[in-house]
């Protein structure tokens, strides 16, 4: 299986490490704008080869692990480059804008909108760890728009690395994630205000 990871940090790096552990005959190709990250990922054995978008035609699976603010511009180009049997999924923390951007793309059926809820405070290839996703929730949005055989391919990987799967629509996902991510800030603010009073 040819797995491409675009953005080799904590999430993308950890995911391909787990895929390599769970499956035989996996070759991981890395695409990254930061050459130092590519070199580090090669040295650490996270990826097997450096690649470019032109190589995406070889991919069986593409993991897009880049900042959400550039996903809208990059995902259409990524989908343009892949073959019909390749599943592309992102790991971004927001979904509505990404799903809206891709709704009329000719290869929308190749895309699966995902948000694995996992992480640490570290970043970069050296932050990648084994078993980051074990027993963690992966929220999938608009699953019905992805070709069934490609859903199956992705779900096989998610289950192999220990993820629990949940389904939501993109707007509800973003609303719930916004509430949860701001809850700690609100709690800290209110606690601080209480102490001051």
Predicted regions located by residue number:
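NAD(P)+-binding Rossmann beta1-loop-alpha1 motif at the extreme N-terminus of oxidoreductases
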Residues: 1-53
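Residues at the starts of beta-strands that form the adenosine-phosphate
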Residues: 2, 25-27, 110, 137, ...
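Short beta->alpha hinge that forms the Motif I/post-I loop of the SAM-binding pocket
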Residues: 33-34, 66, 91-93
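Short, well-ordered alpha-helix to beta-strand connector turns
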Residues: 47, 59, 85, 135-136, ...
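Rossmann-like NAD(P)-binding element
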Residues: 53-82, 86-89
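Rossmann-like NAD(P)(H) cofactor-binding subdomain of soluble oxidoreductases
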Residues: 77-126
């Amino acid at each position: 299986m040819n797995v491409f990871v675009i953005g080799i940090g904590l999430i993308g790096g950890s995911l391909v490490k787990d895929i390599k552990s769970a499956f035989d005959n996996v070759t991981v190709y890395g695409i990254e704008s930061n050459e130092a990250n590519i070199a580090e990922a090669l040295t650490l054995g996270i990826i097997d080869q450096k690649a470019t978008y032109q190589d995406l035609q070889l991919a069986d699976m593409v993991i897009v692990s880049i900042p959400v603010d550039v996903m809208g511009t990059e995902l259409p180009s990524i989908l343009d480059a892949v073959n019909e049997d390749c599943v592309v999924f992102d790991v971004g923390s927001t979904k509505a804008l990404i799903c809206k951007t891709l709704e009329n793309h000719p290869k929308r059926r190749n895309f699966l909108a995902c948000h694995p809820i996992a992480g640490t405070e570290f970043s970069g290839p050296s932050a990648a760890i084994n078993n980051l996703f074990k027993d963690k929730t992966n929220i999938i949005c608009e699953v019905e728009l992805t070709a069934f055989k490609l859903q199956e391919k992705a779900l096989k990987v998610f289950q192999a690395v220990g993820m629990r799967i949940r389904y939501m629509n993109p707007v509800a996902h973003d609303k719930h994630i916004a509430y949860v991510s701001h809850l700690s800030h609100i709690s800290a603010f209110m606690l601080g205000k209480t102490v001051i009073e």
